[in-house]
Amino acid sequence: MLPPKNFFPSLIIFHLFPLHSPITFFGLIDAPFGRFSRKVSRLNLNGNLSWAIMELVSPIAFLTTIVNSSRPSLNRPSRILSGLYLAHYAHRAIISPLILSPKRSPLHITVVLAAMLFNLLNGYLLAVGLAFYPPKEIGWQFVLGVIGWTIGFFGNVYHDEILNDLRRPPTKRIVMSHLPEDGASEKERYKVPRGGLFEWISFPNYLCEWLEWACWSFAANPYPLIAVPALPYLLRAPEYRDSHTVLSIISNFYWPSRLLAPSWAFVLAEVTSMLPRAVRGHAWYKEKFGNKYPKSRNAVIPGIL
């Protein structure tokens, strides 16, 4: 059974997402949120609420696609991975921004709209991937992937809460009971994070999230590439009858024989998006705190980068 007619064109477009990475890496543009937010702008939105809204797009797109899929039902491994995916977004879209997180920096509307578009496409692709390219069985690769996902997920949550504790009063801290006042007064927003992998890198929450989704992808698709049917075959398929124009336009540029599975395309998109921001953020930390910032601390990979 072929996946939905929009799947391959959408996946090809999703592969183009990493092309934006050099723009951020070389500092041409910093996405206006967090430490790089524009403090005064009419296009700024409430940080906590807008974060929740843009992140909810992904699980909504995921569930909508699963419910409307032409596949009768997901197999057991795919149901487990769906549960892990939804657990991540329950925390990321609801628990973290609306319950746990202190007041966040404002989000520029361009960030929110771009994230909503990305999450819409990603949720759709991951759902189709689990439905039409499911893991075959619960073998050692699947179990190892789920264990790795669990470590990455809780590592991500733990280090996020260390950052949140920097903005909480002492009586409301969740992870750290005592924090050194490195280079900042109580009135300043940013302080030097300590604890966990922060002793070695500036962005352990990023590293843990990469581990989380790489292991999820390993459980879903141990072999990262999926075969793409030849274009003449797709054009003859009844379910693709209404998409001839779109397929023909794309084929004028490139029609691959293989593509990254949606889960691995997501990992690539995450790393290429977050790595430049980690490097830029690490430089920002060193500039702001000077000699008070640990010289041995790397940006995102201990001892390497």
What kind of feature is each model-predicted range?
Residues 98-143, 150:
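Eukaryotic endomembrane system proteins
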Residues 94-98, 124-125, 157-158, 277-280:
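Juxtamembrane membrane-interface segments at transmembrane alpha-helix termini
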Residues 1-24, 62-66, 74-75, 118, ...:
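Hydrophobic transmembrane alpha-helices
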Residues 1-117, 305:
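Membrane-helix and juxtamembrane interface regions of eukaryotic multi-pass membrane proteins
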